[in-house]
């Protein structure tokens, strides 16, 4: 736990971020690191219209295909319209393959509680491939990951078995530690 917030200057997106770290854990057996805390984003100021446009463009690029974008799209049942596809990752004879899904929402047992505006999902499979088709992988990512596809972005999300994930309208989801990316 941090007594003072960590201060991050993100010149690329035009934000000063103060992050109050609540917990930081590393499991040496699984090699999984988790942390939690509270971020405070403050927009940088600029009198340059060109700089403001540059920041807004960079923010849109960072948002597109992000976990926040995905969760908001899932909540609104707009995965396909927003450029997402999900597939289940299954292991067969020590080989992983992707299983295309006809019904994204049925496969994750999507349910909306209108009284509290919460969506719950409980995927039928623990490993879910999230494909974002509306943006190609960046050249830097492809350089570091030569086996990756250049035509789309791919992330694999691991869900805890038989645990549901709650999603709020703003894209916040919990329990945060119930998934690993």
What is the meaning of each model-derived region?
Residues 1-181:
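Surface-exposed, low-complexity/disordered segments
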